[in-house]
């Protein structure tokens, strides 16, 4: 009874989920179970609830491709070297012991990296007018220990937005699709947005097309540029292509109609030609039939006359004999 209680306590302890542990890019991480390797029959390793490997006493199989060169997996441990930002997630090892007990250990890993996105999307478009929303968002940022004051700027030389850190403003919540007030850190999901409008036939040459996103502190700086007008020009070109395709459809239809009309005319001409050839043939046949009929009638008449003549001759001969 005491042994079972201790075993249950150990299992509950091992099932406890570790908190999120933060690492920097290129760090190494090790996740291990506390079970004795001699007691383990096999272990399944999971990444975001998907099996990435099966470890047995003899071998390990099932590595996912992105881990092949950077991971070492055994019955008891999962070691990842040279961490990448995309390695962030939940890791879990499920060990099946030889006595039937299942031991689980988990760890949530967050890999910090300096990833800032600068994107633009068209909000409104006509043949001559285009409105673009430019967005600069911090996807991830490596704090690297102590924080020096950070600053974020988005805009053009003449028009820009400024965001100092820490701040309670401009916290973007994806689920709510809006900005809310909140704690200054972590700075992930913090973003600045600015809108710009362009006229297709009016080109301004004072760098109003170029939008820049700056993120800088005492020991770090980031700069990325985006030409918003190029986005509009691509959309205008696509709009023109669609219109050209639409306008060409009736022409193609007319061509098909003309082709069909030509085919029908050709068939009609062929029929007319056939009728022209067949007309003489029908007249000749009719003449032949008439001639044959007339000849037959003449022959019948001759035969009848001959019979009558023979009858009269026979009758007169009989009278003379009397």
From Swiss-Prot:
GO terms for biological process: viral process. The keyword Ribosomal protein does not apply. The chain crosses the membrane at residues 287-307. InterPro entries: Ig-like_dom_sf, Poxvirus_F5/I6_dom. It comes from Variola virus (isolate Human/India/Ind3/1967) (VARV). Belongs to the orthopoxvirus OPG049 family. It holds the Pfam family Pox_I6. SUPFAM superfamilies: Immunoglobulin (SSF48726). One of its GO terms (cellular component) is membrane. Coiled coil: none annotated. Residues 1-20 form the signal peptide. Its main location: host cell. This is Protein OPG049. Disulfide bonds: none annotated. It is a single-pass membrane protein.
């Amino acid at each position: 009874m005491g042994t079972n209680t201790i075993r249950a306590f150990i299992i509950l302890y091992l099932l406890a989920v570790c908190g999120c542990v933060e690492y920097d890019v290129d760090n190494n991480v090790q996740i291990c179970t506390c079970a004795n390797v001699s007691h383990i029959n096999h272990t399944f390793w999971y990444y975001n609830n998907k099996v990435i490997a099966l470890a047995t006493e003899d071998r390990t199989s099932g590595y996912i491709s992105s881990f092949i060169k950077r991971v070492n997996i055994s019955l008891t441990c999962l070691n990842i070297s040279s961490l990448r930002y995309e390695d962030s997630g939940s890791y879990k090892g499920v060990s099946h012991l030889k006595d039937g007990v299942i031991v689980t250990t988990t760890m949530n890993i967050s890999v910090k990296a300096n990833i800032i996105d600068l994107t633009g999307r068209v909000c409104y478009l006509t043949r001559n007018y285009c409105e673009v929303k430019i967005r600069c968002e911090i996807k991830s940022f490596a704090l690297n220990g102590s924080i020096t004051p950070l600053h974020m700027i988005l805009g053009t030389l003449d028009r820009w937005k400024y965001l100092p850190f820490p701040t309670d403003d401009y916290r973007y919540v994806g689920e709510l699709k809006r900005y809310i007030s909140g704690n200054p850190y972590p700075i992930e999901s913090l973003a600045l947005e600015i809108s710009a409008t362009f006229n297709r036939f009016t080109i301004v040459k004072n760098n109003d097309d170029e939008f820049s996103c700056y993120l800088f502190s005492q020991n770090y700086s980031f700069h990325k540029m985006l030409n918003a007008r190029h986005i509009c020009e691509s959309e205008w070109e696509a709009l023109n292509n669609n219109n050209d395709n639409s306008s060409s459809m009736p022409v193609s239809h007319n061509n098909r109609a003309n082709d069909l009309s030509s085919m029908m005319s050709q068939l009609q001409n062929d029929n007319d030609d056939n009728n022209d050839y067949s007309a003489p043939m029908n007249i000749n046949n009719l003449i032949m039939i008439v001639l044959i009929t007339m000849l037959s009638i003449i022959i019948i008449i001759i035969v009848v006359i001959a019979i009558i003549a023979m009858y009269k001759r026979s009758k007169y001969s009989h009278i003379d004999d009397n």
